[in-house]
């Protein structure tokens, strides 16, 4: 619940992405990773000594990072200061201290959050000696490492874990209610939707738990539904951070998404389903959260240009392969379909915690498998004789087979589709595992 967020900052080409990839690989060796996409280089989860945390590579979001203006780096660091619990500042021992390093260090010296100065490419005794120069940045002790070989990353991770702030567990009463987070790119209408939904200015309400650094649960009762609204937007918003890149909206969404049960993704009907929307949707899916998509400002769209059905179909193509998601057309301004939106969100919450008895699951799925068995591989037939839902927080299903290695992704998608055909898992990611019987 109280997952820590780590931001890796620094100028281009100092090894931020290599360090990020090394941290994420540690996690993938422990758990089954969600099928990756190219955006995995920006955000991932890691674990060290039993503590889980999320890692964001700020450099991964900068296009044309060979020629990034100093102002862009400054904005990234300011946002990391706002959003992260711990900041790793990566520098390059080969190049020594550069003017841009000094600019970043000047910003970081002003913050009270933990900052770990990580000197990269230190792989011999001479470079250990050269690294002493980085004391001049005024950030205290530093940690030397070599991101390519992995040397020194263990000490860096030990220091990282020690730097995590102590976070109180939320009150039990807050835990029992569904947690909904309203997410989306800037100016899509998130604030208008929240204010229309709760019928009051959200800054007036009383917080149940949390600090300005944490996602805050605020309890509401609307249309007969009790829920907690996970709110991070507005608490740390600063006008000086111009949110015009994918990085900003995604970074601002991370904590709310990780803290929520269901994410309400608000998109601007006048702009369509853009790259930032896709990234936030992917972030929710990767975290195995429920998702509802609200197409806001639908009242502003010329209806003769595109029908809601065409618009919805276009969005679903962008969501593939996870297309079983409720899409509603709303207007926060006129309060059109707000009740429907909340009802859909509550239903997704119920879908996410749905449990199917093993007997019923086998009765249906074994018939499905018998009608269309897995393709034979190398003259060998795959036989699945037993299946069940795992006792996990999110829907996960395991199928026991004699040759699990021969069951490929297309057949796993077929199994998922058949599960969705028979049970309502709309808005909820499903995991399918094939294990040896």
UniProtKB/Swiss-Prot annotation:
The gene is der. Residues 354-437 form the KH-like domain. Residues 4-168, 178-353 form the EngA-type G domain. This is GTPase Der. Keywords: GTP-binding, Nucleotide-binding, Repeat, Ribosome biogenesis. CDD domains: EngA1, EngA2. Disulfide bonds: none annotated. It comes from the Bacteria. GTP 2 binds at residues 184-191, 231-235, 296-299. GO terms for molecular function: GTP binding; ribosome binding. Belongs to the TRAFAC class TrmE-Era-EngA-EngB-Septin-like GTPase superfamily. EngA (Der) GTPase family. GTPase that plays an essential role in the late steps of ribosome biogenesis. The keyword Transferase does not apply. InterPro entries: G_ENGA (IPR031166), GTP-bd (IPR006073), GTPase_Der (IPR016484), KH_dom-like (IPR032859), KH_dom-like_a/b (IPR015946), P-loop_NTPase (IPR027417), Small_GTP-bd (IPR005225). Signal peptide: none annotated. PROSITE patterns: G_ENGA. GO terms for biological process: ribosome biogenesis. It holds the Pfam family KH_dom-like.
